Curated annotation (Swiss-Prot):
Cellular component aspect of the GO annotation: cytosol; nucleus
Any one Gene Ontology BP term: selenoneine biosynthetic process
Protein name, as recorded: Hercynylcysteine sulfoxide lyase
Organism, scientific name: Schizosaccharomyces pombe (strain 972 / ATCC 24843) (Fission yeast)
Listed InterPro entries: Aminotrans_V_dom, PyrdxlP-dep_Trfase, PyrdxlP-dep_Trfase_major, PyrdxlP-dep_Trfase_small
């Protein structure tokens, strides 16, 4: 584990967290660093200093530099990446503008994030599609999973497969790179939900080249809130549109041979959001200054594992050890049922923390997230909180 004087509570000075708030739920909202926040505010001020110049010339130019930095981080050609506000935006953009044909099938997982399911259901109803689901447990055998995927491909010949890199709850790491290879083999469109990937799971998208992939920079990369990278394979640039439709779509319609239309479409659709997207470059710089991706990911993985060990021992339950470098852990909790939202609204402020819980296949779990500002003592406190929560 990294030296204590580098990671742990000393790191809190780099974030805007309440000093007494115990944040073991980074996987939900992420944690923006102070350096990134300051850069974001600076960019917002610049955007208002000369609105027309900034909106139409300078901000798009700054955006290009950030795209290049992000491309290096995830091993992609910068021409294949654009920004949108969330993973929900990403999946909606792909599913709602893709050129479906009647009776196409979308295949997905039972642990898909709810908004992915909603978007798939909407596309199904709009275009008269078929929707099928692969059921998985809280742990998967990679070979058996891939065999099941291939069997489904052969049996029902889906048009597209939506697969997670790392599912939200329960936390499951999927062999997404091998899934993409299978999709290529059977000419199936690969749509990869990488919401928890960038800053968390190393990626080389030029090598894997999924058809579509979206990943939230605000979760694990310490970027401003609502900031998502959307990867679109070069061959698919003309298959989707940016939502909402904007001037980029108009340019596309006018040009018989459009140049870099993907970038134009998305920049025009999100012009007012460019400052926060540009600030992602500062997030990459900040993370380099505190040790770099490999060291950060190692610490987050190790402290999440240690936290799960502490809590499961205190509760007398078990946890599912995630593979490296996953920094989210499923811990079983002795709940009989999950308290109401109204009860939780009173409970969590009292304890100055927050956790998510779910029932999955007859067991209750909470999800722990590692972070550079956490230490073992935080998880002893969380164990006490969970005990009190389970007694509600």
């Amino acid at each position: 584990m990294a030296e204590n004087n580098v990671y742990g509570h000393e790191m809190k000075k780099h974030f805007m967290l309440d000093p007494d708030y115990v944040n073991v739920n980074n996987g939900s909202c992420g944690t923006e660093s102070l350096a990134v926040y300051n850069k974001h505010v600076q960019l917002l001020k610049e955007a208002q200093s000369k609105p027309d110049f900034m909106c139409n010339a300078y901000m798009p130019m700054y955006m290009e530099a950030t795209r290049n930095e992000v491309a290096k981080l995830i091993g992609a050609d910068s021409s294949n990446i654009v920004f949108c506000n969330s993973a929900t935006d990403g999946i909606s953009t792909v599913l709602l503008t893709f050129p479906w044909e009647q009776n196409d099938e979308i295949l997905m997982l039972n642990v898909a994030y709810p908004t992915c399911t909603y978007a798939a259901d909407f596309a199904k109803n709009q275009h008269n599609l078929r929707l099928d689901v692969i059921d998985v447990g809280v742990e998967i055998d990679e070979d058996l999973f891939l065999k099941e995927v291939e069997q489904r491909f052969l049996q029902s010949k889906p048009r597209a497969f939506i697969c997670d890199i790392l599912s939200s709850m329960p936390v499951i790491l999927f062999p997404w790179e091998k899934v993409v290879k299978l999709c290529k083999k059977y000419n199936i469109v690969s749509i990869i939900d990488g919401a928890h990937a960038i800053g968390h799971i190393p990626m080389n998208l030029a090598n894997v080249d999924p058809d579509f992939l979206f990943t939230n920079a605000h979760k694990w990369l310490n970027s401003p809130a609502a900031c998502t990278v959307l990867y679109v394979s070069a061959k698919n640039h003309n298959l989707i549109e940016a939502l909402p439709l904007s001037y980029g779509y108009g340019l596309r319609e006018k040009e018989s041979i459009a140049v870099d239309t993907l970038t134009n479409r998305f920049v025009n659709s999100f012009k007012q959001d460019l400052p926060k997207f540009i600030a992602v470059g500062e997030a990459i710089k900040f993370r380099k200054s505190i040790g770099g991706e490999e060291k950060i990911q190692q610490y987050c993985h190790e402290i999440a594992l240690k936290g799960a060990e502490i809590i499961s021992k205190e509760l007398g339950t078990s946890f599912i050890k995630p593979p490296y470098p996953v920094a989210m852990v499923n811990v079983e909790v002795p709940l009989r049922n999950i308290p109401s939202i109204e009860t939780q609204k009173v409970f969590w402020p009292k304890y100055n923390t927050f956790l998510r819980f779910m029932e999955f296949k007859g067991k209750f779990y909470t999800r722990l997230s590692g972070a550079v500002y956490l230490e073992e003592s935080d998880f002893y406190y969380i164990a006490k909180v969970i005990k009190d929560f389970c007694s509600l």
